[in-house]
A protein has these predicted regions:
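Short, solvent-exposed loop/beta-turn-alpha elements that line the ligand-binding surface or hinge
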Residues: 108-123, 208-233, 280-281, 293-303, ...
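A structural signal for short loop-to-beta-strand junctions that line the ligand-binding cleft
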Residues: 76, 84-85, 116-156, 187, ...
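Extracytoplasmic/periplasmic substrate-recognition and gating elements
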Residues: 53, 160, 232, 236, ...
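Extracytoplasmic/periplasmic solute-binding protein
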Residues: 132-143, 148, 173-223, 265
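Glycine-centered hinge/linker elements that transmit conformational signals in sensory
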Residues: 176-180, 219-250
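Hinge/lid segment of periplasmic solute-binding proteins
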Residues: 90-147, 167, 173, 200-204, ...
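Extracytoplasmic "Venus flytrap"/periplasmic binding protein-like
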Residues: 45, 49, 53-123, 155-167, ...
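C-terminal capping/gating helix-and-loop segments adjacent to ligand/active sites or protein-protein/ligand interfaces
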Residues: 369-425
Length: 437
């Protein structure tokens, strides 16, 4: 509550300044986003805070549907000559946005053009690395960043005589079997956003390639390689575990969350962003821990990569508009704004200062597990395999991966066949993207 007041506390002063000054029309800045429900309300709080911090601009936060719908609407608006100033785009759209050079206004360039102080070293390297040029220049402003973690039901674990989360994939199987045998839960674990959790982040966590050319960072001629023996071993293990309910497939996105929230599965591998929602929907205490790894992989654990979205600035507006956009980007990076966003959602702060402030405040001691995502992303220096993914047509590639994983779970394809087919089909889309740019 203190942080909310801190952000919005400028309302009185701003209002007084507004009444005292000569009446002038404020310049409207449109921010199209994909945050619905409670997250959308928090977005509105941030917009309100910015509006109350100055009198020249009014920021309109406009919900445009899910990530895909928002990105599609923004692209269509740009082509029609009426783009929003700011558009929220999920991480899989990064390569597409980068390729649209005439449409985007890179954040580092925006801030320089508008004379706004901008120090990229302020930001968590694990967060901004996904969205920078090869020279380390930030293209879009990270906003809602998260990473997959393991949520575990302490009550179900206690029933099996367990008091900690599994650390390795071997323990995932062992602990799940004990919990099921004890009656603590009917299922060991489920997974959400399976391509992101079980292939993209699995690869980074084990420091192996998801795709060649540094996962696409080093060139458009990248190729998918997530059909390696290690990937086949892991996905095959999950497929085998289905027989004993150690693993249960719950759906492509957050569809499996109720299996955990209702106590049916003892563990959930999904985005750290679900933390707040799970706290409200579960009747039991749960912990948060790092992703499991194979103990025989020397490089593991490395670091996980982020999901979520960033804010891209679009071309097509007057310079005076962009001055306000730059002011908002600066406001968004404020330590109190970032701390408010982090503590009121499951997303990580994007600045080192916000993380340090939250540490000093004792928040993590009072909210066990809220720092796991940050530690998991930041404890080790990212490698070429673990700094992120930059692949064209990645939205469609993820759909292909989901199709093939579901064929594996259903038993209609072997693990090797399913992953081979996903790689082959995905590479065709990469070649199509390469030819386009």
């Amino acid at each position: 509550m203190y942080l909310h007041r801190k952000i919005l506390g400028a309302v009185t002063a701003a209002a007084i300044m507004g009444f005292a000054a000569n009446a002038q029309a404020q310049i409207e800045i449109q921010w199209w986003h994909a945050m619905g429900g409670a997250l959308g309300e928090t977005v509105n709080d941030i917009a309100e805070g910015f509006n109350n911090s100055q009198t020249d601009y009014v920021l309109k936060a406009i919900y445009k549907g899910n990530y895909t719908e928002t990105m599609t609407a923004g692209i269509a608006a740009f082509r029609s000559g009426v783009p929003p100033h700011i558009m929220q785009v999920f991480e899989v759209g990064t390569a597409t946005m980068m390729a649209a050079k005439g449409a985007i206004y890179p954040v580092y360039q925006l801030m320089a053009d508008q004379g706004m102080p901008f120090d990229e070293s302020r930001y968590l390297s694990a967060v901004i690395g996904y969205y920078t040029t090869t020279e380390g220049k930030l293209l879009s402003m990270p906003f809602n960043s998260s990473t997959p973690v393991v949520f575990w039901n302490k009550q179900a674990f206690a029933a099996a005589g367990l008091d900690r989360a599994p650390k390795t994939w071997g323990e995932m199987g062992e602990f799940s079997a004990k919990i099921i045998a004890s009656g603590g839960a009917a299922c060991g674990f489920t997974v959400g956003w399976q391509s992101w959790s079980m292939l993209e982040n699995f690869s980074a966590w084990h420091d192996v390639s998801f795709a060649t050319k540094e996962n696409g960072f080093a060139g458009l001629d990248t190729e998918l390689v997530f059909n390696s023996p290690l990937h086949v071993k892991t996905i095959g293990q999950l497929a085998d575990w289905q027989k004993d309910k150690i693993f249960t497939y719950g759906g492509r996105r957050g569809d499996g969350n109720p299996l955990f929230a209702e106590g049916k599965c003892a563990m959930l591998i999904n985005s750290s962003a679900y933390y707040s929602g799970l706290r409200k929907s579960t009747a039991f205490d749960f912990g948060t821990s790092e992703l499991p790894y194979w103990s025989d992989v020397a490089a593991a654990p490395q670091n996980s990569i982020i999901g979520g979205a960033t804010l891209w600035v679009l071309r097509g507006h007057d310079d005076k508009d962009y001055k306000g956009v730059a002011q908002f980007m600066s406001y968004l990076s404020d330590v109190f704004v970032q701390t408010f966003w982090h503590q009121n959602t499951g997303y990580v702060p994007i600045t080192n200062a916000a993380y340090e402030l939250t540490q000093r405040s004792g928040y993590y001691e009072q909210n066990e597990g809220r720092d796991v995502a940050i530690i998991q992303m930041s404890a080790r220096t990212p490698t070429s395999n673990s700094k992120g993914l930059r692949l064209g047509n990645f939205v469609q590639i993820r759909d292909i991966i989901n199709d093939e994983l579901e064929a594996i779970w259903a038993g209609s394809k072997t693990t090797q066949q399913g992953l081979d087919d996903a790689v082959s089909r995905g590479n065709k889309l990469l070649r199509k993207f390469e030819r386009s740019y």
